[in-house]
Structures are given as structure tokens and as C-alpha cells.
């Protein structure tokens, strides 16, 4: 039951991750053995639901890689279901201010600390009430990562960092660059300056900074600045580009692909 991902962040040990968008338990298990510290199961932009998240959690469970789940929104009903199927670490998208960060934390806590509904007899998370004192232990093992993706969220970062129960803050470079007027160009100097400043600010607050970036030089730069959970690739991108490269080596004419954010 111990959340080893949360423990690693608290100890200041950088965690390298991979984004999962294929929504497949088979590919999730394949990648769980690849050596990444954590795997992000994406419920915001990938075609996932509670059932597909569950099967991926089950597939990853025997491996050292730790699952992180991103719901589609900061929704306590959806979060409750994801926690009951066994999610312990959440990446909550589009958090704009401290109140929204507090709502995310409260959704992960049983009363009186929060509003999570008690249904442990039905829940994989408690192993159907086979984990002794699950209801007393669960709150402390929840890891809440909130995602800042706009100029407004950046402005409110100091207040977000003050919210008790927020373990880390993840910078979303794609949406942030779009909000700053540089859609598709997170490497623009102004965007990079904002990202770097935020990483330093988050780390100095005692929280864990995180980001997704497929550029290896930038990933290493962010780690040097103090980022503690960094996703360095996306399964869909890795599969698509590798397949195109293989076909091209045998003379196939692939559709030209404009380099993406990830």
C-alpha cells in the first residue's frame, strides 16, 4: 500500500517517466518493464475511462514502474472512482488557483479531511477490505500533483504552493505555450523562461516540480534546475516515429510529419 512514488519525491529522488496514450493494458505492461520510474495513464487526451485505467493499473502492478493517473478534469466523482480502482497518484489538469488545488486534495481524502466517499468493500484499492486499517491509512498515501498550464495559474503559483496536501506541481508546456501566444512552440524563449522560473520556485517551496518534454537536452536542463518527476516521451509518438523510420528505410513514402510538442 505504500506509495513509493510519493516517497521518492519527498526524498528528492528524480523520477523519469513515460506518457501512456495507447489506452492498452498490453502495451502498458510492455512499457512497465522498460525501466521507467513512473508511467502516466492519460485520461484527459487519450481514450481512457475507469475500466481501461483499471486494466492498465493491473498490468503495471507486478513491475517496479509506478502508475500516475491523469483524470479528464478536477472532478471529485471521477477522482473517487479512479481512487477506488487503485490509483494512489493523481495528476490533476488545468488547476488555476489555490481553491482548485484544495478541491483536488479534498477529493482524495476521506472525511473529515476531505470528501472521498467510503466504499472500500467494493474497492480494489482496499483489496476489498483485506488491507487492515485501509480507511485510516489511505489519506497519507495519496499523492496529489496539480497541473499549471496558463498564465493565470503561473500568477497564482505561490498560493497553489501553499496548499497543504499538494505534493507536486506539473508544468504543462503545450497548453502554457498556447496560452502565452506561442501555440506549438514550447521552446520559445519566453515560454522557456517561464518554465524554468516555475521549476525553481516549486522546488524552493519544498514541493516537487514536474514536466513532460521529449527533447533530451531540455529534460536534462529541467532536472538540473530541480525537476523531480520528468516524463521524457510518449508511447504514441515513439511507436509512430519508429514505424515511419522503419518503413522509410525500405523506401516507403511516409506522410511528412511536422515536429510536435512531444
Curated annotation (Swiss-Prot):
Site entry: Transition state stabilizer: 70
EC number: 4.1.2.52
Signal peptide: none
Disulfide links within the chain: none
Catalytic reaction annotation: 4-hydroxy-2-oxoheptanedioate = succinate semialdehyde + pyruvate
Impact after mutating residue 70 to A: Loss of activity. Still able to bind pyruvate
Gene3D superfamilies for the chain: Phosphoenolpyruvate-binding domains
Binding residue positions for substrate: 147, 174-175
Regulation of catalytic or functional activity: Competitively inhibited by oxalate.
Superkingdom of the source species: Bacteria
GO molecular function list: 4-hydroxy-2-ketopimelate aldolase activity; metal ion binding
Top class in the EC scheme: lyase
Pathway the protein acts in: Aromatic compound metabolism; 4-hydroxyphenylacetate degradation; pyruvate and succinate semialdehyde from 4-hydroxyphenylacetate: step 7/7
Gene Ontology CC terms, in alphabetical order: cytoplasm
Binding-site list for a divalent metal cation: 149, 175
Cofactor note text: Binds 1 divalent metal cation per subunit. Has the highest activity with Co(2+) and Mn(2+), but can also use Zn(2+), Fe(2+) and Mg(2+).
Reported cofactor(s): Co(2+); Mn(2+); Zn(2+); Fe(2+)
Active site feature: 45 (proton acceptor)
Miscellaneous field: The aldol addition reaction proceeds via a rapid equilibrium random order mechanism.
Role description: Catalyzes the reversible retro-aldol cleavage of 4-hydroxy-2-ketoheptane-1,7-dioate (HKHD) to pyruvate and succinate semialdehyde. Is also able to catalyze the aldol cleavage of 4-hydroxy-2-ketopentanoate and 4-hydroxy-2-ketohexanoate. Is not stereospecific since it can cleave both substrate enantiomers. Also exhibits significant oxaloacetate decarboxylase activity in vitro. In the reverse direction, is able to condense a range of aldehyde acceptors (from two to five carbons in length) with pyruvate or 2-oxobutanoate.
Protein name per Swiss-Prot or TrEMBL: 4-hydroxy-2-oxo-heptane-1,7-dioate aldolase
Organism expressing this protein natively: Escherichia coli
Name of the gene this protein is made from: hpcH
Amino acid at each position: 500500500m505504500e506509495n513509493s512514488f510519493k516517497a521518492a519525491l519527498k526524498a528528492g529522488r528524480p523520477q523519469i517517466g513515460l506518457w501512456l496514450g495507447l489506452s492498452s493494458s498490453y502495451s502498458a505492461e510492455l512499457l512497465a518493464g522498460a525501466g521507467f520510474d513512473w508511467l502516466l495513464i492519460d485520461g484527459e487526451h487519450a481514450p481512457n475511462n475507469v475500466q481501461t485505467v483499471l486494466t492498465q493499473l493491473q498490468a503495471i502492478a507486478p513491475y517496479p514502474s509506478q502508475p500516475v493517473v491523469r483524470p479528464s478534469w478536477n472532478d471529485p466523482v471521477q477522482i473517487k472512482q479512479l481512487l477506488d480502482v487503485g490509483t494512489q497518484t493523481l495528476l490533476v489538469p488545468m488547476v488555476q488557483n489555490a481553491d482548485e488545488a484544495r478541491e483536488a486534495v479534498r477529493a482524495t481524502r476521506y472525511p473529515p479531511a476531505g470528501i472521498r466517499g467510503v466504499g472500500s468493500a467494493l474497492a480494489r484499492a482496499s483489496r476489498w477490505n483485506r488491507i487492515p486499517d485501509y480507511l485510516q491509512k489511505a489519506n497519507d498515501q495519496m499523492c496529489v500533483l496539480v497541473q499549471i498550464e496558463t498564465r493565470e495559474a503561473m500568477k497564482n503559483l505561490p498560493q497553489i504552493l501553499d496548499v497543504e496536501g499538494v505534493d507536486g506541481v506539473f508544468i504543462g508546456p503545450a497548453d502554457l505555450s498556447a496560452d502565452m501566444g506561442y501555440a506549438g512552440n514550447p521552446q520559445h524563449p519566453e515560454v522557456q523562461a517561464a518554465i524554468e522560473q516555475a521549476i525553481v520556485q516549486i522546488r524552493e517551496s519544498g514541493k516537487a516540480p514536474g514536466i513532460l518534454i521529449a527533447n533530451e537536452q531540455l529534460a536534462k536542463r529541467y532536472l538540473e534546475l530541480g525537476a523531480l518527476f520528468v516524463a521524457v516521451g510518449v508511447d504514441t509518438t515513439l511507436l509512430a516515429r519508429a514505424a515511419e523510420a522503419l518503413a522509410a528505410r525500405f523506401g516507403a513514402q511516409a506522410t511528412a510529419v511536422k515536429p510536435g510538442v512531444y
